[in-house]
Amino acid sequence: MQGQTQSISFDGREIRLTTGRFAPQAGGSVLVECGDTAVLVTATRSGGREGIDFLPLICDYEERLYAAGRIPGSYMRRESRPPERATLTARLIDRPMRPLFPSWLRDDLQVVATCLSLDERVPADVLAVTGASIATLLAGIPFNGPMAAVRVGLLGDDFVLNPSYREIERGDLDLVVAGTPDGVVMVEAGANQLPEQDVIEAIDFGYEAICELIKAQEQLLKDLGITQVKPEKPDEDSTVPAYLEKQCSKAISAVLSKFDQSKDERDTALETVKGEVSETIAGLKEDHAVRQALASSPKLLGNSFKALTKKLMRQQILKDGKRVDGRGLDEVRQISAMAGVLPRRVHGSGLFQRGLTQVLSTATLGTPSDAQEMDDLHPNTEKLYLHHYNFPPYSVGETRPMRSPGRREIGHGALAERAILPVLPEKDTFPYVVRVVSEVLSSNGSTSMGSVCGSTLSLMDAGVPLKAPVSGAAMGLIKEGDEVRILTDIQGIEDFLGDMDFKVAGSEKGITALQMDMKITGLSVKTVAEAVNQARPARLHILEKMLEAIDTPRDNLSPHAPRLLSFRIDPELIGTVIGPGGRTIKGITERTNTKIDIEDGGIVTIASHDGAAAEEAQKIIEGLTRKVNEGEVFSGSITRIIPIGAFVEILPGKEGMIHISQLSEARVEKVEDVVKVGDEVTVRVREIDNRGRINLTLRGVPQAGDAADVEPQPTPVAPLS
């Protein structure tokens, strides 16, 4: 198994690329290593499909828990469907790769990245993205690469290239940028309310590093004697496109320039134009060149009509600065926002609408035990904030089977989740687990940013004390040669026919999330910066409209939301609260009808819909963990009697025993002669034995009836801070 390994010195680290050793039947394969992280990436091409008009590309990212020396926790003890973070990494590979394949390619393509070893200092995702480019080049697939990706973090005032998981957690920025020799092709970022300029500088910083990795790939191909296969578009019959341009251009332009019509009216008008030209073609002689071209390629008419519509819409924007709905390039559609649209049994709700895009978001408050446990390679194994995004078929007027969430739904939900995370309250002040669900009720572009806005409305309605409200806007771009137009708040047709989908979310203070996808092979950092800056006034305009619906979080939680009490106990006493086999804590929860969670650090969280019940449970736990000293005096009730003595509950949940010899100064023959179950007595702690058992006495202790002589009962100790 011979192979060739080449090393790249990159930012003070060594990246090792091994080719020719692994997966010999794949079209191309490379093992990318940095530190102890190793990712095997393969690219394979099979024969073309007949009758399709899209690129059948599949990008998969596979995690194996052996990479971290772990055995899966499932019943079968093997990996099953990819976890959410693996799905997001697969999308991270797909998004910069897809626009670099030629639009005419119809071969089945599959890129598979498998994490074989994980070093927590070196996240595997960006290595997988760069490896995907290398494997594709080695496979000889037509590809407008090379392409590479890096991660940029921000620690203090310094940018960090490819930070560790710990540095990402500590920093204010987690940005992944991918690029080609032509420019930036993908950006994905989460930020702690950073100013636009900081994010732009981070993208520029990352692209400079990308250029080094691109040169390294070019050198690798040269050393291996491989010539890159550049896409060469096959000759196409222009008969049908030319005919449509002559017959339909004026009619299509008239539809696109009628700004007072709705989306449905515009779509219907375009279908009418298409139907009329179809009838005209049907009336042509059978030996007409157009009829013959369509006979060999039935989808050519629809594709050519779509291409002509795209061309004319883009010309209208570039030349006239007008969009299909009459808006200017930097104009936002009409905004509507409402909070509390559902009954209060739903803890919080918000309805956000921008143009024809409408999203209903709901917020649910849960207890710490509702946190999501993540069984993947990421060191952070628990999620306290969840955002789920649903996109039903009726939102676009279609019918199809309702299935489990796909990659798109998972990706959009993760973006909206990321946008809100930086403004959530700290766990110490708001210990709830929070789940937001965004239901897309109508879609005409930018539903993910609509979900961000809906999330803010629902969280504020639920009484979550956000550090700042967050809104989002989607930017688009039309580029022909050196001519560039950036569009604010793109709608569906502009997303579909444009060159960029750039989503920016943030507060008044700064950016919290950013995602950019391209349909061209790259964009200059300067143009990216213009889009980032143009998004700010749009975000703030949307935020202003949202704050008209609700400007501060509600003072009170929904009466149907759980009430949480959180306090700290000595971690060494956690076992005392839990009890043998969990009997003690189970008894407390059953007695008080509460839900109790205890963390390893000693933080106790009690959840209940009844505040008094939660306080009762807190008193019991504080009593169990309260240190009792010899000589202290307590008042309590007799809970049970045994032949040699009686037990007294001196603190909630904590008992001590009075031996029969300590019941009276005189000799006692039978315990019941002195006390009975339920009697209130005052006792002194005589001793605490080496097993922690509390021994009590009544001897010499004044009882009720001579209260003036009774020593005061000590005040319970406050929770440990």
Curated annotation (Swiss-Prot):
- One Pfam family of this chain: RNase_PH_C
Which locations, inside or outside the cell, does it occupy?
Cytoplasm
Record keywords: Cytoplasm, Magnesium, Metal-binding, Nucleotidyltransferase, RNA-binding, Transferase
Catalysed conversion reaction? RNA(n+1) + phosphate = RNA(n) + a ribonucleoside 5'-diphosphate
Instruction: Please name the GO terms of the biological process aspect recorded for this protein, alphabetically.
Output: mRNA catabolic process; RNA processing
* Chain sites annotated for binding Mg(2+): 495, 501
- Has keyword Zinc-finger? no
- The record places domain KH at 562-621
* Domain (S1 motif) ranges: 631-699
Q: EC annotation?
A: 2.7.7.8
Q: What is this enzyme's class at the first EC digit?
A: transferase
Query: Is ATP-binding found in the keyword set?
Result: no
The terms describing its cellular component in GO are: cytosol
The UniProt entry's sequence similarity note says: Belongs to the polyribonucleotide nucleotidyltransferase family.
Function noted in UniProt: Involved in mRNA degradation. Catalyzes the phosphorolysis of single-stranded polyribonucleotides processively in the 3'- to 5'-direction.
State the name under which the record lists this protein. Polyribonucleotide nucleotidyltransferase
Q: Its gene?
A: pnp
